[in-house]
């Protein structure tokens, strides 16, 4: 039996204020329940109504055709994402509203109104056309977190080109793999980007990648740093020179709802990265609606999601979701602690940010740096907080709620994936009570099921299993680019007929889902299956601990031994006494079964460039393997792994 034992008890419940609830889009549990039941009973009627809030050049014949794994949404409908994100607003009072508020790491500011952005996007769409880009061609975008990244994405969608954004922190090798797989015709990059006061050599990386990736005919370079960069005449072009020569009118290409919108690569733990393909109509409709309801967006909001556009969160909730809603979206180029650990809070106060969406890994860093930094700032503009990227442990949730939100801002703890396109499980901030550590309830139209290894539903609220989705939803991935077999193998083979997320979860008596981490991060200790996230949450609840990552290593007696890698808060030092204290603390919080066999103190944990802990590498280190295997292109700092290996 493939069931997870859940041993973390978290009973605290928090409620949105009456004032928040009264003004929210969805105001009560009853309203949520009524709409949710309708969305499941009549998905065609429900999603047809939502999609009709957007502009379609031609109406659809059928809202939903077919079932998992190959549903089609809004069949026969024609639309254009850039038209809906820009032209729709430019025809209203929003033309002069700020669309993007940008701050560079060195401190410069730019504000683009909807009218400004509309003109820039059309100009760059014409640039792409002049470089020979046609509908269906792939364009790779390798840029820092600057407005040109959003402009390039929207310009691709305007002419029906398929964008593939590659995070600016990736190496030349990772970039080359992604260009080759997509067979991109044009690469858009910059002379460099700023990060922690240094310069990221994007153009040099691009040149290196193109020695290996030969499909690219043209490279467009944004002048960001002013650094001297190598140049290939005929192939390389300055962004500003091409833009000066381009007209600012470009009619949007009417796109079939199921035509490709973008490819985004997600790392497999082995083998080459997977190119997740999203399509136009369903993705647009779903990110529009989730942004509106999950973040309770109003016209006067200043919304800031701290993700980079190189990740799905940046696609859906920095660029497309906010702009489809006519919102003001904040973009920041640099690190959260540059030049000091209060950079984020400075930005919140400076621009009057009202909705703030960030990752648990960032929140744990803020905790480590101490309450003094946010304490220097008012933060009184904030009305709603969100988290994304991994489960948030209750301790970090409570810190976020009290220290950043001052106890007055609801928190939406959102579960979703690159593959799902948009938020799948969350609380709706005016409708639901919040439970720290629980993501919440399914969004409209989402039908989750927790299954055991025999494909049977897990009914016991204290038991976890595999988190699956049993019905199609509009923004789901349609395939893995160029590899339909891998698509079926990866997502639909484990539990036939349903989408398997790869995550473990449990559902409590109130229908709230708690995400227990990746199923391949499950420990099997003396016949008990334990989720690593619960043990990590117990460790982080100790006052000395900043972050923890728990993995298993083979053990001849227990099957797996529990190894915890722990970083400490400032003011605490590693010692054998502290190791014993932490082991006893976990045993007390969870039970003796979860007591770590080994605790290793470290100054940092190996993370991806989006801040997720790479437990796969820690498993190899814990097992004493000298050679690190598998794809490490997303690893942010290789020296962390080397130091951990030396300390082993």
UniProtKB/Swiss-Prot annotation:
PTM info: Acetylated. Deacetylation by the SIR2-homolog deacetylase activates the enzyme.
Modified residues (N6-acetyllysine): 612
Keyword annotations of the record: Acetylation, ATP-binding, Ligase, Magnesium, Metal-binding, Nucleotide-binding
A Pfam family annotated for this UniProt entry: AMP-binding
Keyword hit for Cell inner membrane: no
Residues that bind ATP: 389-391, 413-418, 503, 518, 529
CDD domains (UniProt xref): ACS
EC numbers for this chain: 6.2.1.1
Substrates-to-products reaction catalysed: acetate + ATP + CoA = acetyl-CoA + AMP + diphosphate
Function: Catalyzes the conversion of acetate into acetyl-CoA (AcCoA), an essential intermediate at the junction of anabolic and catabolic pathways. AcsA undergoes a two-step reaction. In the first half reaction, AcsA combines acetate with ATP to form acetyl-adenylate (AcAMP) intermediate. In the second half reaction, it can then transfer the acetyl group from AcAMP to the sulfhydryl group of CoA, forming the product AcCoA.
Family as reported in the entry's similarity comment: Belongs to the ATP-dependent AMP-binding enzyme family.
Name this polypeptide is given: Acetyl-coenzyme A synthetase
């Amino acid at each position: 039996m493939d069931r997870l034992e859940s041993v973390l008890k978290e009973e605290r419940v928090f409620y949105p204020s009456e004032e928040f609830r009264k003004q929210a889009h969805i105001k009560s549990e009853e309203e949520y329940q009524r709409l949710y039941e309708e969305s499941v009973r009549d998905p065609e009627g429900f999603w047809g109504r939502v999609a009709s809030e957007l502009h379609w050049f031609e109406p659809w014949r059928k809202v939903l055709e077919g079932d998992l794994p190959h549903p089609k949404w809004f069949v026969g409908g024609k639309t254009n994402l850039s038209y809906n994100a820009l032209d729709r607003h430019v025809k209203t009072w929003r033309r002069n509203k700020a669309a993007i508020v940008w701050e560079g790491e060195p401190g410069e500011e730019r504000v683009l109104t909807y009218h400004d952005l509309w003109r820039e996007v059309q100009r760059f769409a014409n640039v792409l056309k002049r470089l020979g880009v046609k509908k269906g061609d792939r364009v790779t975008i390798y840029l820092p977190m600057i407005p040109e990244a959003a402009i390039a994405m929207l310009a691709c969608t305007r002419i029906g080109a398929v964008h593939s954004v590659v995070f600016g922190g990736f190496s030349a090798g990772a970039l080359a793999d992604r260009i080759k797989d997509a067979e991109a015709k044009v690469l858009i990059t910059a002379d460099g980007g700023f990060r922690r006061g240094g310069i990221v050599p994007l153009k040099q990386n691009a040149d290196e990648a193109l020695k290996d990736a030969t499909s690219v005919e043209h490279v467009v370079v944004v002048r960001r740093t002013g650094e001297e960069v190598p140049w290939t005449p005929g192939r390389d072009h300055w962004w500003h020179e091409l833009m000066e020569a381009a007209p600012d009118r470009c009619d949007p290409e009417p796109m079939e709802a199921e035509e490709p919108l973008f490819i985004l690569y997600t790392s497999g733990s082995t083998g080459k990265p997977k190119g997740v393909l999203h399509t136009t109509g369903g993705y647009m409709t779903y990110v529009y609606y989730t942004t509106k309801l999950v973040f309770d967006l109003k016209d006067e909001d200043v919304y800031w999601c701290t993700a980079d556009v190189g990740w799905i969160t940046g696609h859906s909730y920095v660029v497309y979701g906010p702009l489809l809603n006519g919102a003001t979206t904040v973009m920041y180029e640099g690190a959260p602690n540059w030049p000091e650990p209060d950079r984020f809070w400075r930005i919140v106060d400076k621009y009057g940010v009202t909705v703030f969406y960030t990752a648990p890994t960032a929140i744990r860093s803020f905790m480590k740096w101490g309450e003094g930094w946010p304490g220097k700032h008012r933060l009184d503009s904030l009305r709603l907080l969100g988290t994304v990227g991994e489960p948030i442990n209750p301790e970090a949730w409570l810190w976020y709620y009290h220290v950043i939100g001052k106890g007055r801002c609801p928190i939406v703890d959102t579960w979703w994936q690159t593959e799902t396109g948009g938020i799948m499980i969350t609380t709706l901030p005016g409708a639901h009570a919040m439970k720290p550590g629980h993501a919440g309830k399914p969004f409209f139209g989402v039908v989750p099921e927790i299954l055991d290894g025999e494909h049977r539903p897990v009914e016991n609220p204290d038991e976890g299993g595999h988190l699956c989705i049993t019905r199609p939803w509009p923004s789901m991935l349609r395939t893995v680019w160029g590899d339909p077999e891998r698509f079926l193998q990866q997502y639909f083979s484990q539990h036939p007929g349903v989408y398997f997320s790869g995550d473990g979860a449990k559902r409590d008596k109130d229908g709230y889902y708690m995400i227990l981490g990746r199923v391949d991060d499950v420990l099997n200790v003396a016949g008990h299956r334990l989720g690593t996230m619960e043990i990590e949450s117990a460790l982080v609840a100790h006052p000395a601990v900043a972050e923890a990552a728990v993995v298993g290593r083979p053990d001849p007696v227990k099957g797996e031994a529990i190894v915890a890698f722990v970083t400490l808060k400032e003011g605490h030092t590693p010692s054998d006494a502290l190791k014993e204290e932490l082991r006893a603390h976990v045993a007390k919080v969870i039970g003796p079964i979860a007591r770590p066999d080994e605790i290793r103190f470290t100054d940092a944990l190996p993370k991806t460039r989006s801040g997720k802990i790479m437990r796969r590498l820690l498993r190899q280190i814990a097992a004493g393997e000298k050679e690190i295997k598998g794809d490490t292109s997303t690893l942010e700092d290789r020296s962390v792994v080397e130091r951990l290996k030396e300390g082993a």
